[in-house]
Swiss-Prot record:
SUPFAM superfamilies, A to Z: YheA/YmcA-like
InterPro entries recorded: Com_YlbF, YheA/YmcA-like_dom_sf
Record's signal peptide: none
Gene3D superfamilies: YheA/YmcA-like (1.20.1500.10)
Name of the molecule in the record: UPF0342 protein ABC1519
Domain of life: Bacteria
Family under the similarity heading: Belongs to the UPF0342 family.
Any Pfam family matching the protein: Com_YlbF
Coiled coil segments of this chain: none
Amino acid sequence: MSNAYDKAHELKEALAETQEFKSLYDLHRQIDADDIAKKMLENFRKLQLDLQQKQMQGVQISEEEAQQAQQQFELVSQHELISKLMDAEQRLSVIITDLNKIITEPLERIYGEPPQEQ
């Protein structure tokens, strides 16, 4: 079993070497050095988290909260660094999703969809 763990550590290192990860890391450092961008991003992420928690608890999000979230999104999207960061997060998320599909492929043989007819 240690072989699977060794491969996971190799994958971790390979992911850290991707341009997508390096770009995201650099953008985080730039935002941390920019007090305005950092505060804007923190406020936006807090609002996102609050709304997600409400949804998970089955609480309906008000029209006012939805508008506030949309306004916050538009505001942070206009900030060049934050916009680049969000794009970089999305690109890395695609890679991680693809890797997860590959890693869990063997489980599809057990739990997945029936084989497709050709």
